[in-house]
């Protein structure tokens, strides 16, 4: 499916089109060949090139960053200088390609221009890129970074409720690979947090919303990582709970759940986005969020919690009845 479904809310509070960023992780292609694939797809100018990373500046699109997803290797390459000039770093880079995924970080694009990325995934596939299902030890995936329509508490709370009501269903909708489920990288929110989130029908103050999240989720390893967005609002609170310099403040959600199926000819980034689209739409339905939250709490059983399979089946039927799935 190559059509990106458009959400009901396309613009932010300033009237600007919302932006979406994608990060794609894969193996099977060297860093050098990945860069070449991008250059063969768009008119690109290389910048900041090392043996572990390269930025490609593309007119009318922005900067696509290509890098080996290994913090140590990237640091060593930066210290060595320009692209492939240090033999030791270059050798290490080549060895890393066997086990370390290449990551392509796309620039944030206006929500109506996401189809500009379709040629990229096709070119990477032709170059030999392999996605989630090709590794038993690595949890390759696609990350989606949609800008939040507004940074007020009510808006963020509704997105959190929408995702939380759907998180089990989303795992099934994406057919998340067992290897990825077994890691901590895409852990779901704990049920204790969901019960707290659903226990009121009025949005908490922003400081309380952030504090509640950090209390239950003091980690980057969540399927919907809110730390970048909350850091944009209150960086000190986030760093106090999760002192990690990899957290970059930005007014976006960081959705990490989808597989990367780049080696499949019938897959594109639209497949991943169109599942997230369901979260977008549910987040705009205040009354439905209230009703579904109450229903979830009614289903809670002492010690056992909510029965997952039953809830997934209920949500799947509800979404179909409301033309959201």
Could you say what each language-model-derived stretch is?
Residues 1-102, 108-122, 126, 151, ...:
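C-terminal accessory/tail domains of diverse enzymes
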Residues 147-149:
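Catalytic palm subdomain of template-directed nucleic-acid polymerases
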Residues 143-145, 254:
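Structured core elements
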Residues 136-143:
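Short, conserved phosphate-binding/catalytic loop or strand-edge motifs used
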């Amino acid at each position: 499916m190559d059509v990106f479904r458009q959400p009901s809310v396309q613009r932010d509070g300033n009237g600007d089109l919302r932006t979406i960023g994608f990060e794609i992780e894969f193996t099977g292609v060297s860093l050098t060949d990945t860069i070449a694939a991008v250059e063969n797809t768009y008119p690109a100018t290389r910048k900041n090139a090392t043996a572990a990373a390269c930025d490609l500046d593309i007119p009318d699109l922005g900067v696509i960053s290509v890098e080996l997803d290994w913090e140590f290797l990237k640091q060593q390459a930066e210290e060595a200088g320009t692209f492939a000039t240090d033999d030791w770093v270059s050798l290490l880079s080549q060895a890393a390609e066997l086990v370390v995924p290449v990551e392509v970080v796309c620039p944030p694009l206006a929500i109506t221009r996401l189809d500009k990325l379709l040629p990229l995934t096709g070119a990477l596939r032709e170059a030999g890129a392999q996605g989630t299902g090709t590794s038993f030890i690595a949890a390759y995936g696609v990350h989606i970074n949609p800008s939040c329509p507004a940074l007020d508490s009510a808006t963020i709370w509704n997105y959190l409720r929408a995702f939380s009501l759907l998180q089990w269903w989303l795992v099934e909708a994406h057919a998340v690979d067992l290897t990825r489920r077994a890691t901590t990288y895409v852990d779901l929110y704990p049920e204790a947090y969901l019960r707290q989130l659903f226990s009121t029908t009025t949005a908490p103050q922003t400081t309380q919303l952030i504090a509640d999240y950090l209390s239950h989720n003091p980690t980057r390893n969540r399927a919907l990582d809110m730390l970048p967005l909350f850091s944009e609002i209150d960086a000190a609170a986030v760093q106090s709970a999760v002192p990690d310099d990899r957290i970059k403040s930005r007014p976006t959600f960081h959705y990490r759940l989808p597989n990367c199926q780049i080696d499949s000819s019938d897959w594109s980034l639209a497949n991943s986005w169109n599942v997230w689209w369901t979260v977008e739409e549910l987040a705009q339905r205040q009354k439905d969020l209230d009703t579904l939250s109450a229903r979830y709490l009614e289903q809670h059983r002492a010690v056992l919690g909510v029965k997952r399979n039953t809830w997934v089946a209920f949500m799947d039927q509800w979404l179909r009845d409301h033309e959201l799935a």
